[in-house]
Amino acid sequence: MTGLLNRFRMRRQCLLAQDAVLHDTARVFNMAGNRPAIDIGRFTHVRGELLTFAHGGEIRIGEYCYIGEGARIWSARSIRLGNRVLIAHNVTIMDNLTHPIAAAARHDHFRQIIQTGHPRDLDLGERAVEIGDDAWIGCASVILRGVSLGKGAIIGAGSLVTESVAPWTIVGGNPARVIRELGPDER
């Protein structure tokens, strides 16, 4: 019964298309309370965590996507996933720094979260993230702010992606580097 109640509560935090599924391990946090800020497309399965910050952010997920268990997508500006995107377990995607860089500002930010909740006016160096159709992000990879993954891009497991990736390209490593381009028969 608890899982059912939790899924009902999460549905009130987002727009969930017909036949999209929030699994028992899914978590949805819409800090601003703006339901359309998290939009999940048809036939998408979410097992991970979706979070928009109190001062803004939006997450748009296309159709037939999969977000694995332990994956985290945190937005303070904009994270968009195309159609048929596969996000493996324990992937992290962020369009922001999560905390200010200056130590004093970081301390003030943390104190405010503890005392009054997440602030609604904060500069976290936000830069949008775009993930193209048919992209695949391997287990435990991290996609940082400002990155675009082209159509069909593949990110190897455990990669740290700090720069945009061209369509139909495989990258891997820390930091991620081009491994090879996919051939026409692999597209």
Regions found by a protein language model. Give the residues of each.
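Domain-scale signature associated with acetyltransferase and cell-envelope carbohydrate enzymes
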Residues: 1-101, 110-112, 116, 121-134, ...
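Extracellular carbohydrate recognition
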Residues: 147
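Binuclear metal-ion centers of metallo-dependent hydrolases, dominated by the metallo-beta-lactamase
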Residues: 155
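Conserved sequence/active-site signature of Rossmann-fold short-chain dehydrogenase/reductase
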Residues: 160
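Catalytic PLP-binding core of fold-type I/II PLP enzymes
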Residues: 164
